[in-house]
Amino acid sequence: MAKQLSTARKFKMITGKDLFQQQKAMDTELKKEDGEITDLMEFVQYGLYLALFQDNIVKAKSDFSDFRSSFEFDTDGKGLKELVELWQKEI
């Protein structure tokens, strides 16, 4: 089997943020009564989608950059829960 980058490493290369730290931040925000969770959830959802399904890191970074300015993204109908479950199979 050929060597490959982990999903967490690809996520960091694409978004500039650590996936585990982003997951912790999401958990923290969910516990707050007035937590701001939408931006964080979309950040993780789209970053994780790109890390899992876009093999071209340069294109993934470009797509993520576009998302950061427009807040529009397409995950082919895959929700955050499904993406996290796919990633957790790797851990």
From Swiss-Prot:
Gene3D superfamilies referenced in this protein's UniProt entry, alphabetically: Uncharacterised protein, phage p2 ORF12
Keywords, alphabetical: Late protein, Viral release from host cell, Viral tail assembly
Induction comment from the UniProt entry of this chain: Expressed in the late phase of the viral replicative cycle.
The keyword Ribonucleoprotein is assigned to this record: no
Record-level GO BP terms: viral tail assembly
InterPro entries referenced in this protein's UniProt entry, alphabetically: Gp12 (IPR048803), Gp12_sf (IPR043077)
Superkingdom classification of source: Viruses
Function: Probable chaperone for the tape measure protein. Might help to maintain the tape measure protein in solution during tail assembly.
Quaternary structure, from the entry: Homohexamer. Further self-assembles as a spiral.
Protein name stated in the entry: Chaperone protein gp12
